[in-house]
Amino acid sequence: MASSSLLVTIFLCISVFFFSSVNANEVTVGGKSGDWKIPPSSSFSFNEWAQKARFKVGDFIVFKYEAGKDSVLQVTREAYEKCNTTSPKASYTDGNTKVKLDQAGPVYFVSGTEGHCQKGQKLRLVVITPRNSAFSPGPSPSEFDGPAVAPTSGAAKLAGGFSVVFGLVLGLWAFFF
């Protein structure tokens, strides 16, 4: 009897982990072309691209670029606005950078190559908190400077709600049987 409860508990933990990670997305900067480089024309803007996408806490943003010739810097709003690359929050140089978006609010990235930010190789995106997560931290008041993005889709809310209910049912079943 105890071994079946242990198996159910292990299954419960795996299930909750699986269903909570199902909602995370990987979004490549720039869309299908996926290149982190100076925009080829003034008609393309990384910020306009980002406004058409939805980023939520737990998602990953992926930057693809030539390692050794470029880099990605996560910076403050002030550094983003001035294209200041001297004191980044984080620096990435591997050519295939995957950054987890772990906090709601605006996030700022610029190229670490001199002169590239001034030519438009910079990105501001807004990360939203999924409605099915009550524990994600909000943005700090000094960092948040833009409007909120619309809430997540009904499918994401349904999947999150299902994982909570499923976990509770399995937990109760394991406890009593």
Swiss-Prot record:
InterPro entries: Cupredoxin, ENL_dom, Phytocyanin-like, Phytocyanin_dom. Glycans are attached at residue 84. Disruption phenotype: No visible phenotype. Plants lacking ENODL11, ENODL12, ENODL13, ENODL14 and ENODL15 have a reduced seed set due to aborted ovules as a result of pollen tubes failling to rupture and release their sperm cell cargo. It is a lipid-anchor; GPI-anchor. One of its GO terms (molecular function) is electron transfer activity. Residues 1-24 form the signal peptide. Residues 25-129 form the Phytocyanin domain. GO terms for cellular component: plasma membrane; secretory vesicle; side of membrane. Pfam families: Cu_bind_like. A lipid is attached at residue 153 (GPI-anchor amidated serine). Mostly expressed in seedlings, siliques and flowers, and, to a lower extent, in roots, stems and seeds, but barely in leaves. Disulfide bonds join 83-117. Residues 154-177 form a propeptide. It comes from the Eukaryota. Its main location: membrane. Keywords: Cell membrane, Disulfide bond, Glycoprotein, GPI-anchor, Lipoprotein, Membrane, Signal. The keyword Disulfide bond applies. It is found in: Cell membrane. The keyword Nucleus does not apply. Belongs to the early nodulin-like (ENODL) family. May act as a carbohydrate transporter. Required, together with ENODL11, ENODL12, ENODL13, ENODL14 and ENODL15, for male-female communication and pollen tube reception and burst at the synergid cell surface of the female gametophyte. This is Early nodulin-like protein 15. It comes from Arabidopsis thaliana.
